[in-house]
Amino acid sequence: MSFTTRSTFSTNYRSLGSVQAPSYGARPVSSAASVYAGAGGSGSRISVSRSTSFRGGMGSGGLATGIAGGLAGMGGIQNEKETMQSLNDRLASYLDRVRSLETENRRLESKIREHLEKKGPQVRDWSHYFKIIEDLRAQIFANTVDNARIVLQIDNARLAADDFRVKYETELAMRQSVENDIHGLRKVIDDTNITRLQLETEIEALKEELLFMKKNHEEEVKGLQAQIASSGLTVEVDAPKSQDLAKIMADIRAQYDELARKNREELDKYWSQQIEESTTVVTTQSAEVGAAETTLTELRRTVQSLEIDLDSMRNLKASLENSLREVEARYALQMEQLNGILLHLESELAQTRAEGQRQAQEYEALLNIKVKLEAEIATYRRLLEDGEDFNLGDALDSSNSMQTIQKTTTRRIVDGKVVSETNDTKVLRH
């Protein structure tokens, strides 16, 4: 980091003939200051420029007025020698004063240089924090994208679970319908069994009735034969041969047996077919129900795993949010600290600028005094060199001419140290 401090001082005074006398009135002409700082703390430059003009006539306490009054009152060479002696004494005192002021000026310049070296404006480099901030922002963005992707996966899993739930409900309804059909078929089987039992009961009753009728017929035949035998009569009846009741009963019995057998076979065949169909349907439905139960179990496991994943993702999201809040709070605190440091540095910089301006003003005042003394010394030296040829009236007549001495001091400061200093003095005539 480098600073360039430039101070420009200009002093105007009127000339007295061939000698220079300082003017005691002062009027600041211009004062300008500029500050430039590059990004990152490099290439910073502070430039201070001041220009002060002093102009005016000789006051009642000035040197020219004293000389004019002394010479006008005396008018003799003796008085001029006494005046020159007093001027020599004053010159010696002025030289001592100039030497002391130069010493004080060097001391002030050394203090200014030390102050600039110690409390030079410094700007810390925060560029390495920018990389960390960018990395954290990239991580936050990646975590946000991951959270969005996880939320999308959760939504897809929820939709898939809803589809499986609909399929499960459909299969459950089909299973209930099949179970209802099976229950109805079981009722039909029960009714058929009851009908079969009723028919078997009727067959048994018919068999008993047939046996009873056969027994009665045999008893009647035996009774008739006994009556015929006891009467001793031979009765010949020219009549057709009577039918054999036993044969008829046997035929009837055979017919009933055949009918019962056919009915039994038909019923057995029908109910066997119905039972086979029902068994096939039940087997098919049982297989479908088993598959549906297997699918339901898998869906339940999938839902449980998805719920576990959802809980883990929620926990991960909560932890990431907590981490994000902690990072934001930590970096907010660091930013506050950095802002505080920046404000402190700006305050120190403002104080340094104010101190520099104050010291520059003091230096300017001392420089003005030095210029005045140098002008008076030049005047005294000219008086001593000219001797009796000095004409105060000519000096007063030429007092309208004015010269400006402009002194520019440029200092280059790198990392709080003065690496170069240049002084430039210009004399401008008006």
From Swiss-Prot:
Record-listed Phosphoserine modification sites: 7, 10, 15, 18, 30-31, 34, 42, 49, 51, 53, 60, 93, 100, 177, 305, 319, 323, 398-399, 401
Region annotation (Coil 2) ranges: 249-387
PROSITE patterns assigned to the protein according to its UniProt record, in alphabetical order: IF_ROD_1, IF_ROD_2
Effect caused by changing residue 128 to L: In CIRRH; interferes with the ability to form normal filaments
Ranges for region Linker 12: 225-248
Location within or outside the cell: Nucleus matrix; Cytoplasm, Perinuclear region; Nucleus, Nucleolus; Cytoplasm
InterPro entries attached to this UniProt entry: IF_conserved (IPR018039), IF_rod_dom (IPR039008), Keratin_I (IPR002957)
Induction line: By IL6/interleukin-6.
Main location: nucleus
Outcome recorded upon mutating residue 34 to D/E: Abolishes binding to YWHAE and YWHAZ
Keyword presence, Transmembrane: no
PTM annotation, UniProt: Phosphorylation at Ser-34 increases during mitosis. Hyperphosphorylated at Ser-53 in diseased cirrhosis liver. Phosphorylation increases by IL-6.
Reported impact of residue 53 to A: Abolishes phosphorylation. Abolishes binding to YWHAE and YWHAZ. No effect on caspase cleavage during apoptosis
Result after altering residue 10 to A: No effect on phosphorylation
Positions of region (Coil 1B): 133-224
Modification sites for Omega-N-methylarginine: 45, 55
Modified residues (Phosphothreonine): 52, 65, 302, 404
UniProt-reported outcome of changing residue 42 to A: No effect on phosphorylation
Region of interest (Necessary for interaction with PNN), residue spans: 70-373
Protein family (similarity comment): Belongs to the intermediate filament family.
PANTHER family for the chain: INTERMEDIATE FILAMENT, KERATIN, TYPE I CYTOSKELETAL 18
Associated disease: Cirrhosis: A liver disease characterized by severe panlobular liver-cell swelling with Mallory body formation, prominent pericellular fibrosis, and marked deposits of copper. Clinical features include abdomen swelling, jaundice and pulmonary hypertension.
Subunit structure, as described in the record: Heterotetramer of two type I and two type II keratins. KRT18 associates with KRT8. Interacts with PLEC isoform 1C, when in a heterodimer with KRT8. Interacts with the thrombin-antithrombin complex. Interacts with PNN and mutated CFTR. Interacts with YWHAE, YWHAH and YWHAZ only when phosphorylated. Interacts with DNAJB6, TCHP and TRADD. Interacts with FAM83H. Interacts with EPPK1. Interacts with PKP1 and PKP2.
Stated name of the protein: Keratin, type I cytoskeletal 18
Organism: Homo sapiens
Gene name linked to the record: KRT18
